[in-house]
Amino acid sequence: MTDKEKRLQRQSRIRNFSIIAHIDHGKSTLADRILEKTAAITQREMKEQLLDSMDLERERGITIKLNSVQLKYQAKDGEEYIFHLIDTPGHVDFTYEVSRSLAACEGAILVVDAAQGIEAQTLANVYLALDNDLEILPVINKIDLPSAEPERVRQEVEDVIGLDASEAVLASAKAGIGIEEILEQIVEKVPAPSGDPEAPLQALIFDSLYDAYRGVVAYIRVVQGTVKAGQKIKMMATGKEFEVTEVGVFTPKAVPADELTVGDVGFLTAAIKNVGDTRVGDTITSAENPAPEALPGYRKLNPMVYCGLYPIDTAKYNDLREALEKLELNDSALQYEAETSQALGFGFRCGFLGMLHMEIIQERIEREFNIDLITTAPSVIYDVYMTDGEKIVVDNPSNMPDPQKIDRVEEPFVKATMMVPNDFVGAVMELCQGKRGQFIDMQYLDANRVSIVYEIPLAEIVYEFFDQLKSNTKGYASFDYELIGYKPSKLVKMDIMLNGEKIDALSFIVHRDYAYERGKVIVEKLKELIPRQQFEVPVQAAIGTKIVARSTIKAMRKNVLAKCYGGDISRKRKLLEKQKEGKRRMKQVGSVEVPQEAFMAVLKMDDSGPKS
């Protein structure tokens, strides 16, 4: 048998698939069971959420990064099949990670909770899978729960998504029920990868990480051709050339292999020192015999939310730059640029996909790189049209131009789809109205679940909307959003002044109708949070030159009369005058320390009055 025939025979037994599911529908547990069933790991190595290798993932019980693993499975037809399972995140902020992993597959297992049914993010991920022409295998999980209704959910999969669910596997990943059926369905229904092992090499980089000893490790899916150690490769986007030092697969541990050929999912090292040379979504080809064109990569994702990250210890500015460079390597949705603030010194303006993404990056910097951060209030990108016809893009409230020169301001709107139980429809609609939302559509999925669609300004969703939605529905709602474009709004910039000085990091953009209430609440909040000084400190909220709210932090007072026992009033008056004069001088030169909580207070407006 020739090399080519061997490769083609092996290729016909490869199955690449990923698991898509809403958070908590049992995706990581199902992955654990599949690993056990195919004996990829011993019982001794087994631990919950095995593929979620980041501590943060295990703590929060969510998958953030995609992971891949190669498994061997002895099917009932007597053949040994090679499975590549690519694990995907389920949260709306990590849709990009999902689209990356789906591009490396031919099939997807759709896990739906037998008690909860289809959720908003399940839908979003299914549409991504359909865009990539994947074979979708529905699995109804958690059938051992007392509240499970597998038949209702099966009907829901057919009605809401339009998939034929008559052969959907009823399973319980926790109890290990139905796992074998799932594996057999993968063998029967997921197509083998198509491609020619002899053609010029085309391999898609779907992730990468930096290893101190081996340089950059690229995770690849080979689409055409073959790659082995010693071969010269070329990155199609950057044109850089390297010599491959090692190729291999994950089982889940990294194991070297002789070669990777069509359909294989594995890793490649080539002494690549510079993180920027392996862009996720780039195509690797052979330097001697390059492919005529690159593979269609990924959509470039634009950040939706911006905020400033500043090191508390300014000496760590360069460490923060390095941390962001390393995180950006395998999180291409993260963007950053240097910025300075009068209040906080040197830092970076970073762009994220959403609030969870922002929190996770922040936590990863603090944990993995040991840098304590101050973060400023998140903001979205506004389009500002000037009276002279010029258009300015503003992602930082302190860059907002002079209101006299502004013709109009447009802000991004999203179409938010919420799936909620019937009883909470009123509460959810009230929440959306309070967030300047506009009602679009409402559909009853079944007797007790409703899908509600609103158009809401992104700035309203950015902070705590998801938490408020969950608390208004006792945790039952699910939520997904997509950007629909920009619309004009009556927006103004509000400055916060301490002791007559503007604090640039506390500025924010607010809807004019809510400006007064919001200013009042923030001023009161800052009054509580900023420690008292030796002198009186006025806290003011201003729009342009107009002060809309004011409060005063009272001065701390030392009792200068303590050492006067009885005696002459003029002596006491002299001491009091001297104290008063000292306070006056101090007020002129004194600066006010602003604690981190004060920056977050600008955001947390949920416990008082209307919100902007």
Swiss-Prot record:
The keyword Isomerase does not apply. Gene3D superfamilies: 3.30.70.240, Elongation factor 4, C-terminal domain, Elongation Factor G (Translational Gtpase), domain 3, P-loop containing nucleotide triphosphate hydrolases, Translation factors. It is a peripheral membrane protein. It catalyses: GTP + H2O = GDP + phosphate + H(+). It is found in: Cell membrane. One of its GO terms (cellular component) is plasma membrane. PROSITE patterns: G_TR_1 (PS00301), G_TR_2 (PS51722). HAMAP family: LepA (MF_00071). Required for accurate and efficient protein synthesis under certain stress conditions. May act as a fidelity factor of the translation reaction, by catalyzing a one-codon backward translocation of tRNAs on improperly translocated ribosomes. Back-translocation proceeds from a post-translocation (POST) complex to a pre-translocation (PRE) complex, thus giving elongation factor G a second chance to translocate the tRNAs correctly. Binds to ribosomes in a GTP-dependent manner. This is Elongation factor 4.
